[in-house]
UniProtKB/Swiss-Prot annotation:
The modification Phosphothreonine is found at residues 20, 588. It comes from Homo sapiens (Human). The gene is SLC6A7. It is found in: Synaptic cell membrane. The lineage of its organism: Eukaryota, Metazoa, Chordata, Craniata, Vertebrata. GO terms for biological process: glycine import across plasma membrane; neurotransmitter transport; proline transport; protein catabolic process; sodium ion transmembrane transport. This is Sodium-dependent proline transporter. It comes from the Eukaryota. Belongs to the sodium:neurotransmitter symporter (SNF) (TC 2.A.22) family. SLC6A7 subfamily. PANTHER family: SODIUM-DEPENDENT PROLINE TRANSPORTER, SODIUM/CHLORIDE DEPENDENT TRANSPORTER.
Length: 636
């Protein structure tokens, strides 16, 4: 193949014999709507949005705990290896799909309509996650407001929500040093504040009897949705500006917490506990699985957020560079967050006279119990508490922007003539609907429903979606064709590393993750509460529903075609006639035009050699010889 460096930036010459006036009208209409779809106002908008999307709550409350329980510093070996095998390639693949087509998670499956069900599965998953994720933001807002006092309300016992088991955990000392406390039969004020005041979980008998709605949580959830709506009101035009603050300010707060943490007595004890390498853990398959899971969920692959953000890029945005900036930045942020968390936990363990592993927790237990308790031991505790929860707020909002933008973009791209002019109204309706669906999370037993959603909404179903996407693009659409599409955008083809990962390593890793999660399946639980069988069944069905959308989409695509079953499968697997770059100026090479005069017009790349004695197709951008054309035809 002859490569013309930089030529892809010029507008192609469209042969008149290949386009009818009606076709030209359609193209103009498409270009008009592509222009109205909008783009980021600057390249930094996209980069910061991706950073904000990936760097979320999991970096603070999941990575540090996973690191210290899976070998400390040795955990970084499988972590970065899985980042290279799975994280970076899948991240780049999703960005490439979105930027090349300028389409959301549903319409992007013009690449192969047979797999459009994977896009619907993405929307189901991201919708369920968005419902409970905003409830977590509501909890953060609750604690943020509670920090605006001279004394933190979870600092002491003696409040109406405390029980006889409440004990202010302060170390006892004698002349020879600290005497460790027996914490087995006691409960900290911060834990009772979280469970008995914020959640009021004692008012529920379980997931089947959620109890009453908590008006304070209900208002916090409403505020969270109002904030999200105002920030996505004008799509990426507004959210792209908000992230200049929400994606950068957390780093300032994290730095302040880190500096404060490492200067506390006992801090290095916690850091040593966090990073001391235990290389024998590397012999355990569990450690490698945990590393892959952390990478998979941390980068947000498969939720559609990356694809959506990239769809608003200009056609030649350097997403190759952006991929490495975001993925490596996400990893470094996770490690730094571990220093900030464990330095404070080391100080806390020294103050309590207990080992670090007795105070370290993961998930909400770290954010809403352990760390708030540690804040009460610091001078100016309300100030540090406010900073911590404000950091969590900004981290959570960035991810929520992506979830909502994914849903809105996907649906408006499917019905652009009706919804795109009313995108703000549609966004508001989505927020209202999700707020109403999330009200059950504000009840006394709302935490049980949140745990159920968290455990099943984005579990094995998400892995099935990503595996399907990877195989559909590389095996059905074709790895060579996909690499040439990337060449049109970036001026170079992905090398052997990306091809090997897309074809073999990434799908195999995800398949291993899915099998492991099924084999090691454990029923959901929250503390000592075990979920009833019907709740477990509901969760499993929730995960299966996203998987079933893929074969359901295949069935619909096949029924829309004509001919035998094999012919229908072939036709449904082929790219749609209008697949390719959205703007005419970027439709070069095989995408330069579609054939007219045929009873069933199909992409030019398939039929170019079959009409008018043309044996190759060429324009000012790319020249493709007879061998490549035959390869394209054989792929179909």
């Amino acid at each position: 193949m002859k490569k013309l460096q930089g030529a892809h930036l010029r507008k192609p010459v469209t042969p008149d014999l290949l386009m009818t006036p009606s076709d030209q009208g359609d193209v103009d209409l498409d270009v008009d709507f592509a222009a109205h779809r909008g783009n980021w106002t600057g390249k930094l908008d996209f980069l910061l949005s991706c950073i904000g999307y990936c760097v979320g709550l999991g970096n603070v409350w999941r990575f540090p705990y996973r690191a210290y329980t899976n070998g400390g510093g040795a955990f970084l070996v499988p972590y970065f290896l899985m980042l290279a095998i799975c994280g970076i390639p899948l991240f780049f693949l999703e960005l490439s799909l979105g930027q090349f087509s300028s389409l959301g998670p549903l319409a992007v499956w013009k690449i192969s309509p047979l797999f459009k069900g994977a896009g619907a599965a993405m929307l189901l998953i991201v919708g369920l996650v968005a419902i409970y994720y905003n409830m977590i933001i509501a909890y953060v807002l609750f604690y943020l407001f509670a920090s605006l006092t001279s004394d933190l309300p979870w600092e002491h016992c003696g409040n109406w929500w405390n029980t006889e088991l409440c004990l202010e955990h302060r170390v006892s000392k004698d002349g020879n040093g600290a005497l460790p406390l027996n914490l087995t039969c006691t409960v900290s004020p911060s834990e009772e504040y979280w469970s008995r005041y914020v959640l009021h979980i004692q008012g529920s008998q379980g997931i089947g009897s959620p109890g009453e709605i908590r008006w304070n949580l209900c208002l916090c959830l409403l505020l969270a949705w109002v904030i999200v709506f105002l920030c996505i009101l004008k799509g990426v035009k507004s959210s792209g500006k908000v992230v200049y603050f929400t994606a950068t300010f957390p780093y300032l707060i994290l730095l302040m917490l880190l500096v404060r943490g490492v200067t506390l007595p006992g801090a290095w004890k916690g850091i040593q506990f966090y990073l001391t390498p235990q290389f024998h853990h590397l012999l355990s398959s569990k450690v490698w699985i945990e590393a892959a899971l952390q990478i998979f969920y941390s980068l947000g692959v498969g939720f559609g957020g990356l694809l959506t953000f990239a769809s608003y890029n200009t056609f030649h945005q350097n997403i190759y560079r952006d991929t490495f900036i975001v993925t490596l930045g996400n990893a470094i942020t996770s490690i730094l967050a571990g220093f900030a968390i464990f330095s404070v936990l080391g100080y806390m363990s020294q103050e309590l006279g207990v080992p670090v592993d007795q105070v370290a927790k993961a998930g909400p237990g770290l954010a809403f119990v352990v760390y708030p308790q540690a804040m009460t031991m610091l001078p100016l505790s309300p100030f540090w508490s406010f900073l911590f929860f404000f950091m969590l707020l900004t981290l959570g909002l960035d991810s929520q922007f992506a979830f909502l933008e994914t849903i809105v973009t996907a649906v408006t791209d499917e019905f652009p003539y009706y919804l795109r002019p009313k995108k703000a109204v549609f966004s508001g309706l989505i927020c209202v609907a999700m707020y109403l669906m999330g009200l059950i999370l504000t009840t006394d037993g709302g935490m049980y429903w949140l745990v159920l959603l968290d455990d099943y909404s984005a579990s094995f179903g998400l892995m099935v979606v990503v595996i399907t996407t990877c195989l559909a693009v590389t095996r059905v659409y074709g790895i060579q064709r996909f690499c040439r599409d990337i060449h049109m955008m970036l001026g170079f083809k992905p090398g052997l590393y990306f091809r090997a990962c897309w074809l073999f390593l990434s799908p195999a890793t995800l398949l291993a993750l899915m099998v492991y999660s099924i084999v090691k399946y454990q029923p959901s639980e929250y503390g000592s509460y075990r979920f009833p069988p019907w709740a477990e069944l509901l969760g499993i069905l929730m995960g299966l529903l996203s998987c079933l959308m893929i074969p359901a989409g295949m069935l619909v695509a096949v029924l829309r075609e004509e001919g035998s079953l094999w012919e229908r499968l072939q036709q449904a697997s082929r790219p749609a006639m209008d697949w390719g770059p959205s703007l005419e100026e970027n439709r070069t090479g095989m995408y330069v035009a579609t054939l007219a005069g045929s009873q069933s017009p199909k992409p030019l790349m398939v039929h170019m050699r079959k009409y008018g004695g043309i044996t190759s197709f060429e324009n000012t951008a790319i020249e493709v010889d007879r061998e490549i054309a035959e390869e394209e035809e054989s792929m179909m």
